[in-house]
Amino acid sequence: MKQRQLALKILGEVEEGSFLNLALKKQLKGLSEQDRRFVAALLYTTLENKGRIDYVIDSFTSGKRIHKLVRNVLRLGVCQLMFFETVPESAAVNESVKLVEKSPKRQLKGFVNAVLRNIAQNLGKIEYPSQEAEPAKYLSIMYSYPLWLAERYLGAYGFDFAEAMLSYHKKAADTCVRVNRLKTTRQELLAKLEGRGYQFHEGEYIPDCFYIRNIVGVDELDLFQKGLLAVQGEASMIVAEAAQVRPGQAVLDACAAPGGKSAYLAQFAPGRLVCMELHEHRALLMQENLSRLGVEAECRVWDASKILEEQIEAFDRVLIDAPCSALGLLYRKPDIKYTKHPEEIQMLAETQRAILSACAQYVKPGGRLIYSTCTISQEENDQNIDWFLEHNRQFFQVNLAAVLPERLMSRAREGRLQLFPHLDGIDGFFLAVLEREKR
């Protein structure tokens, strides 16, 4: 199957609800590295700019309804015209027409040809919403985010900050990994990566963090399969570091799957590591990941919002990486941008409060509760911590300066840290560390 035909197939799957990373993993097996990179780049770029691309298509088709397969062909074609300088205009148009010719909608090849040629000739004449008159609509179209999210950020942070945040994106080809010190050392892993010819650069904040360039299917690497490295975002590593786990301590990871933070915490030699997960299939995946990485842990299927009586005051550290709206990941997960809805934020905040209330009871006097999310929503972050402290006077906020990488110390405030992708170059995470008073 040719590159663009495969891209069209995967785009259709994503539009039907599949996750892009999983679809790529499944469909790219057996392809050359060059083909993998092109297909992945075409799909990431198309989805990253889907709102703007659709605006362009609608501008040249008078907003008429277009069959979803034909629209996807047009999306891929317009993406190449707008963002792929190495693809000739003629190739972007002609290859798109060929895709329609091979489809059940082959009778529309003339329509696709005419639309793409018209767009190619008039790209510089497209009128976008006015930044001054319609700032939220401008941000939504130009950076391909839902209008409600553009309005939300505009109201919370102002235009310049909102634009910087929405316009930021990271190369899809950079895969963030960390050294698994349970099986190797930093020096040994570096030597193996260099020996295999991989290009990589060091992380921004964590010494054991690396970004491998231009790789699709990292789980196919022998270094991954042997458990020498783990795929994990750098912001997630910062959260695990902030837990300040000491040898021999009892540690609970309350919302643990797929196990990235649990595996990181295991490197600090806790006396007991318990990993809880709500869904059995995710718990099984977590067990597989932990086993591959050489981690010994108790894995339990349990709803973290419900209290386990036998675990009350049993842990020195309790980590809650709460289920959240994941708004801090949208810059690198373009396929989920348009699956988000404002109503879910308040629902998630209520779930998070239930988890906080239950898990706080597992913390020993003098122990710590670490709360994190991968979102930028006030309701799920600061407002939750304010609520929790008001209802749990036995907890107080810890000064994060002692637990953060030096470059982030100035960003912490009152025991909390909010990371932004465009400011910090990593996922948008929230972190709060709370300590329970000693008796």
Q: Where are the model-predicted features located?
A:
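S-adenosylmethionine
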Residues: M1-R439
